[in-house]
Regions:
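A short beta-sheet element
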Residues: 51, 55-106
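Non-catalytic DNA-recognition/assembly elements of restriction-modification systems
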Residues: 1-16, 133-146, 158, 162-191
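A short glycine-rich beta-alpha junction/loop motif
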Residues: 63, 78-84, 117-140
Length: 191
């Protein structure tokens, strides 16, 4: 049955007001939650405005969700993210990984592009996400769907690794056969 997503997720906007020493994370479209993604110091030394993301909660940057930068936090007991991020909890009736796959789907990415607002960058407010429809079968069926999608994702990941290895092999064989094209150790004629 189709339901309104907002009936199954709830905003969580708790700030690190006590300036606890909590790891700072970003959310990327390829790796999900990443510590020190940009390889530099956090823009602000004052992290009291940063939002806490407990284990199992979702977070996304409203101006990056259009490329799939959304994930649920499964790294630490709690982490913090930029104050710009939206953070939300999920109802026990909605399997987190099922929601994750839904939010990364082409259907949702197209819908985000259609409803997001902004002059320079598209921006998706949490209130807009609440209005998205989601097919919500029973929990057991959600878990079965997740198992299938997890297996497919694993196969895709392994195939991508194989392609990378084959690409490396082709490059190394080329170098063995013809040498470095810059140094031209075999004195190939150049036209």
């Amino acid at each position: 049955m189709k339901v309104r997503l907002g009936d199954y997720i709830q905003e969580y906007s708790v700030k690190n007001k006590d300036d606890e020493n909590i790891s700072v994370y970003s959310v990327t479209n390829t790796k999900g939650f990443c510590k020190d993604y940009f390889g530099k110091e956090v823009a602000s030394k004052d992290k009291t405005t940063y939002k806490i993301v407990p284990y199992g909660y979702f977070a996304y940057n409203p101006s990056r969700i259009n490329v799939g930068s959304v994930d649920w936090q499964r790294k630490e007991k709690k982490v913090i993210v930029s104050p710009l991020y939206n953070v939300f909890s999920v109802s026990p009736d909605l399997e987190r990984q099922y929601l994750y796959y839904y939010l990364k789907s082409d259907f949702v990415l197209q819908r985000i592009k259609a409803v997001a607002t902004g002059s320079v960058r598209d921006n998706l407010k949490l209130s807009m996400l609440y209005e998205f429809p989601i097919e919500l079968p029973a929990l057991e069926k959600q878990r079965k769907i997740v198992k299938i999608l997890d297996k497919v994702s694993d196969v895709i990941e392994k195939k991508e690794q194989e392609l990378e290895q084959l690409d490396t092999l082709v490059k190394s064989r080329f170098a063995e056969m013809f040498g470095d094209p810059i140094q031209n150790p075999y004195n190939w004629s150049i036209k």
